[in-house]
């Protein structure tokens, strides 16, 4: 199930690139973020697929003055939510301003910058490991849009339908 994306882009930009990391049948073990005072510049992922580490393409320019690596404790830790802010006005550089990642055990961030000219978003994916990946767009100024994939549960929980025995 595709959720989002949220964000804004510069209508004058001619180099918007769509990206999609939701087709993998793997789990994210690391997230790499380049960011600065203007917001989130790029995002990249490392997946565990078939017992091997696979690095995604970098989505956005590597131009922020700060860089962070989020290391998830695979296979015990998984993403349960993402939230952040994006610039709400049409202008130069209206890209993703901040991101925060929630897992079943921790919270990472916020990374980037916060401000009163930003709109906020939050995707809460529940307590189960239902996260299926990210998608979005970027251009030369940074990450423009971001969204997530949710893998809905496919197995019903067991319900005890047995009747209690009566005692005399």
Curated annotation (Swiss-Prot):
User: What SUPFAM superfamilies does the entry give?
Assistant: Mannose-binding lectins
Give the subcellular location: Cytoplasm
Coarse class of the protein's main subcellular location: cytoplasm
| Jacalin-type lectin domain residues | 1-152
Alphabetized GO MF terms: carbohydrate binding
Keywords, A to Z, come to: Cytoplasm, Lectin, Plant defense
Q: Which GO terms describe its cellular component?
A: cytoplasm
| Biological process according to GO | defense response
InterPro entries recorded = Jacalin-like_lectin_dom, Jacalin-like_lectin_dom_plant, Jacalin-like_lectin_dom_sf
Q: Which family does it belong to?
A: Belongs to the jacalin lectin family.
Q: How does it assemble?
A: Self-interacts. Interacts with RTM3.
Question: Per its database record, what is this protein's job?
Answer: Unable to mediate restriction of long-distance movement of the pathogenic tobacco etch virus (TEV) without causing a hypersensitive response or inducing systemic acquired resistance.
Q: What is this protein called?
A: Inactive protein RESTRICTED TEV MOVEMENT 1
According to its UniProt entry, this protein's organism is Arabidopsis thaliana
**Gene this chain is encoded by:** RTM1
